[in-house]
Amino acid sequence: MHHARNVQFSNIHVSTVDEDVRPDFVEVDTKGWGDQGDGTYRNPXSDPDVIRVGNKXYMVASDFHXMGMQVLESDDMVXWRYISQIYRRFNEPGWDANLHYAGGSWAPSIRYHSGLFYVYFCTPDEGLYMSTASNPAGPWAPLHLVKRVAKWEDPCPFWDEDGQAYIGRSQHGAGPIIVHRMSADGKTLLDEGKTVYEGPIAEGTKFMKRNGWYYLIIPEGGVGTGWQTVLRARNIYGPYERRIVLEQGSTGVNGPHQGALVDAPDGSWWFYHFQETPVLGRVVHLQPARWEADWPVIGVDYDKNGIGEPVATWKKPVSSVGTAGFQTCDDSNDALGLHWQWNHNPVDTHWNLTDRKGWLTLKAMPADSLKMVRNMLTQKVVGYQSESTTKVSIKGDSYAGLFCSGKLFCGVGLCKDGVFIEFGGQRKIIDKGSYQEVWFKVTNDCEQNRHLFYYSIDGEHYQPAGSAFAMSGGYWKGIRVGCLTTFLQAKRLLRARHLRMLNSTISIKNSPNSLADC
């Protein structure tokens, strides 16, 4: 069994500077993240979709093999908090055996219609799914399978003024864009769909209508190298006019595309998109937008070629509403904090929060490698520099501790023979001894791509566990950290105490536009 308590993040420390450069700009340290002095953006996500209902904005994003699509809420469109989870397990073959890395939810869409919030997503192998809720904080209805089909992706629903429902989507292999009619409740497709556009790696469909124009807001050109395209037509089936509205240009933001065009309460417009990075994964950015001749203009056209480029910093959409700290699960004995995610489906018979009040219990199960360990509990890395620690004690032949995952799965932990490290499926004892308890730590420097495990016998003096190593994102996700326990033969007992995911102090001179993602 694995006991954990006091799961928490530390606050990011922020200091302000004068906004005296230009009316719309502030000078910032671009290594910082999130809000400027009066709010912090935490734990964002890839392939974002955002809507605004009233004075609040809501975000969903791809979660792939992690359970199970978090919903985030914001008062100012910059600082976000988790408020719910759409599903907690995926009841399809292979999801109880860690067989669907890079599968699961791809590029969801969230919409609000007639008093209900709707979320749609496709999976590579299983089909098109949707769920609804009257309150975005949940509960969300059980997943409804709209169509059993493979290789669809990136769906987005749309309800026209006459009540007719549609859904746009793309196909694996990046296109074409196809539009279907749906039943009014959004649960049934009414036709086989009509192709309305073909383009270079056209995907990520987002529908909207404004001033009588139907818009398809789509990325093209590929994840790491693409651009943002907008299509418009007077008829939902076209013909569509095309315009490129955002590109990398002279900036360092590669592939600035795929996201959501959203208006703020004051009527200003904004565009969320992601940027693929090699270690952190897909990093969310927010661009200013406006309309000219019924075309969206996004970012700033620095080279005057008619196409916007990402800005480094910009005035916030909504004035500050106060700083929000990192979310933890310390304030509840009834549920894990929403920032925690299981890798694939959890085995509910092998974890609980009831064996000891305020503690998490994980029961060890056999696995051939770290990648295949069941009940692997993970969370996103926060920012470029972070630190995570846990305290572990064991009985029997269990292996347990702290791990990092991406393309590589590696970890440090405790077994009956002492402290071990594991890389590439090879487990090595680095400190022999019969320890009752050991503290473990990992530091993640995603800017230098330098990561290092540590261990401590007293919780104060740490020494390296092996050498520094490089990491890269994998299976469409950035690197993650978490805790696990496993055994090779018979069931054993693990006790891990004072588990806490502790973000290191990050001094932010001011708020950049980059919104961190893993």
Swiss-Prot record:
Molecular function terms, GO-annotated: xylan 1,4-beta-xylosidase activity
Keyword Chloroplast set for record: no
Active-site annotation: D47 (proton acceptor), E203 (proton donor)
Pfam families tied to this protein: GH43_C2, Glyco_hydro_43
Coiled coil: none
Signal sequence annotation: none
Known EC number: 3.2.1.37
Site positions per UniProt: Important for catalytic activity, responsible for pKa modulation of the active site Glu and correct orientation of both the proton donor and substrate: D154
Listed name of the protein: Putative beta-xylosidase
